[in-house]
Amino acid sequence: MPSFDIVSEIDAVELRNAVENSTRELASRFDFRNVDASFELKEETVKLAAEDDFQLGQMMDILRGNLAKRGVDARAMKAKDSVHIGKNWYKEAEFKQGLEALLAKKIVKLIKDAKIKVQASIQGDKVRVTGKKRDDLQEVMAMLREANLEQPLQYNNFRE
């Protein structure tokens, strides 16, 4: 029986490249001359630091632009509120890996409500979809692309 997995993953290399490109762009921008501002990547969290809250907003725009250039979906990023400590402002942007249980249940419900002849099962941080026909599986993929979910999805492990 044909099957595939629905996952939500981020390419760590592309994320690192986007952060490094953002740092380079920050150094070359005129409005950030003589300003103490930086991007710092630790695992799947990017920490932004600047002297003003307004500058943090500009830095988030720079980061989003570089993520788009590198092919990383910005919907996977969850930005926390700005924090003022001392003379600097800080903001953290966390990148979600894997499907949370609530989102996985929502995906399974969408598939079942579509009345397509496939079975969907939650397996850890992914959803496995199996069906008798390859066309049914492709229909599920198209339906999920159309659905407006809060996290980007990838389809892998396609088996005949």
Curated annotation (Swiss-Prot):
Family annotation (InterPro entries)? DUF520, UPF0234-like_C, UPF0234_N, YajQ-like_sf
Q: Name one GO cellular component term.
A: cytosol
Q: Does the keyword Transport apply?
A: no
Sample GO molecular function, one term: nucleotide binding
User: What's in the keyword line of the UniProt record?
Assistant: Nucleotide-binding
Indicate whether Transport appears among the record's keywords. no
Q: Which Pfam families match?
A: DUF520
Known function: Nucleotide-binding protein.
The family line of this record is: Belongs to the YajQ family.
The protein depicted here goes by the name: Nucleotide-binding protein VC_1508
Organism source for this protein? Vibrio cholerae serotype O1 (strain ATCC 39315 / El Tor Inaba N16961)
